[in-house]
């Protein structure tokens, strides 16, 4: 029996003003994550009559849960850059000299008041400069 690898493909959908993360899982005997397709009509990336979109792997990371996480970019069925693929536009202007990233912050809040729970400070630095 062949050894199978499991890949979880992750991409951004076409919802605006903010895209959502999407994923789907593929089990295959291939050593690297292959290109894959999905129905873009359910992710705001295609019309119902012609809904195929392509997922092209960009970077793969090992996951402690036993499958690989595959960050992808979306292309239309004709292999052109999909309008929701902002990574392709960024790749055109970024060189090896540039670094950029995304930071996502999380705060626990009281569901009744919406106020942050716990410490009032974002970090412990500059605690003496906080004015209440």
Residue ranges and their predicted role:
Residues 1-93:
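Acidic/polar, glycine-rich intrinsically disordered N-terminal extensions of enzymes
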Residues 14, 24, 111, 128-129:
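Residue-level marker of positions within ordered structural domains that often coincide
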Residues 96-103:
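Flexible, glycine/charged-enriched surface loops at secondary-structure junctions
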Residues 103-105, 129:
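Acidic-residue sensor for enzyme active/binding pockets
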Residues 105-114:
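Short, conserved secondary-structure transition motifs
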Residues 113-121:
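Enzymes and membrane/adaptor proteins characterized by extended Gly/Ser/Thr/Asp/Glu-rich
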Residues 122-131:
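Single conserved hydrophobic/aromatic residue that forms the stacking wall/gate
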């Amino acid at each position: 029996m062949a050894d199978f690898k499991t890949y979880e493909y992750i991409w951004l959908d076409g919802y605006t003003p903010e895209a959502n993360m999407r994923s789907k899982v593929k089990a295959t005997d291939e050593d690297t994550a292959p290109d894959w397709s999905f129905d873009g009509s359910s992710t705001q990336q295609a019309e119902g009559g012609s809904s195929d979109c392509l997922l092209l792997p960009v970077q793969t990371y090992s996951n402690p849960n036993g499958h690989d996480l595959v960050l992808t970019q979306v292309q239309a069925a004709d292999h052109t850059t999909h309008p929701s693929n902002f990574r392709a536009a960024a790749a055109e202007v970024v060189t090896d000299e540039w670094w950029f990233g995304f930071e996502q912050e999380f705060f626990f809040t009281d569901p009744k008041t919406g106020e942050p729970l716990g410490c009032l400070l974002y970090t412990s630095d500059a605690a003496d400069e906080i004015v209440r």
